[in-house]
Amino acid sequence: MSQQQPWWNGAVIYQLIVRSYRDGNGDGIGDLQGLASRLPYLRWLGVEAIWLTPIYPSPLDDGGYDITDFKAIHPDLGDLAAFHRFLTAAHSQGLKVVMDLVMNHTSTLHPWFQRARWAPQGSPERDIYVWSDDPHRYADAPVLFRHFESSNWEWDEVAGQYFLHRFLRHQPDLNYANPFVQEAMLDVVDFWIDRGVDGFRLDAVPFLCEEEGSRCEGLPETHAFLKRLRQRVDSHGRDILLLGEAIQPVDEIAPYLLQDELHGAYNFALTAHLFAAIASGSVDNLRNCLEEAQQVVSGCRWALPLRNHDELWLGDGHLIPEEVIQIIRAGLHQGQGHWLNWGINRRLAPLLNGDPGSNRVLHALLYSLPGMPCLYYGDELGMGDWPGLRDRDPNRTPMAWTPARNGGFSTAPDPLLVLPPITSPGYDYRVVNVEVQKQLPGSLLNWHRRMLTCRRLLPALRYGDFELLKCAHPGVISYVRCDGSMTVLVAANLSAAGASLHLDLSRWSGVRTREVFWGCEYPPASEDWFVYLPAHGFSWWLIGEVEDVSSD
């Protein structure tokens, strides 16, 4: 690109849970010291940024998203000095660090809430949270954690009032109508930027403000605060990412991506449509979703996850149509019996029944669509999960590094481990781990590394324009990414049967066409260009004469 791009434009983001990644001091809990020791692996893999789920002090009733201090590190994970050492090491490896910032709520054990519940009604201390005498206020706001909560309100005996909690009852919502709350959260952002972080993943960003008669999502007051947040971030004078988690349809996310608000947002609707395409073998809904996303917000501002630390969120018919939800529930048989809240509580590989073809074709799309691909730790290995653990813990088990005890995660005795390592058939850590897969040229890990290497060497896949191509086959999606003189053609078969394609490449008629990964020559582009894709097969092709990028 002739114009300097911010670091996050098209960057591959690797999400990890510090307490489940690597134990550096032998106490059974992953920590910043252990994570720092694995930074060379992340550099080797080819990711460009690390998203840390919350590392703040917390009673851990919701995996650290219930925070008691926004300006400290949980003692299990280290301290601010350990964070500084980790951040310095990450930057020395060329890796950016994105913090998870939970702006919507705190823990009930946060000092703010403890003062609020004892303070008199109408006092500044009480007003830091949202209180009511009526538990039926904001009745149109859906209960998000419907398997755990029956209401968005919880009675507090000390306060003599109900407090609002859009999440769990131990996570009271902050009151963003209070200027103190806004200034306090902006001060938290300043604190971490001053320590060198490169961005923030903004948790639950639509729910900051409330209004009677609405779903209490994405209200004008919320956008007004996000504009203030963007101004504060920009005032630091360097590229700092603001990435919003808004589980909403793409047309409702668009206002967050105005030039004076967030830099990017997750496209969870696209995630759902990718799984629906695999489940049904049809790409019609996926094509429509991609077209809508690019019409609403063009370019590479969408963050693209397949899985993360939560359930695969499908929603109540608001995020995606009910018929698409039913396609996923009926087609992904390994998700049956694992429904949690509004989604499926399984890791990627088990959800796909361990099928490597489905796994690879979904990631091939993820790495070639416009946006910021998000890779959840362990998915590069095809790690399994532990159904039966509480809440979302089945998806948050320790990273498998070696065939040694505990998968090389920790030397601690089994009872001290933060969670048990995977030992289920087909996913046992003694087989599915980094050390073993590094030695196997055809492993999923080495495949991911090769894909990320090719993506890094092909600017069209990171920055390029996106255009869907017409394709008569109902199970195949095809598109081109173009950046200057470079054009990359992508075709992916989401069906469980082979597909013969005839693509119209007449605009490149007679131009050389080569497959990216192995450099294989294909017939020159033509008006009726033929290619065969096996079941769940895909390919990337370079169109035209460019530098050879097939070797690494």
Placement of each model-derived feature along the sequence:
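Active-site and adjacent substrate-binding regions of carbohydrate-active enzymes
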Residues: 1-552
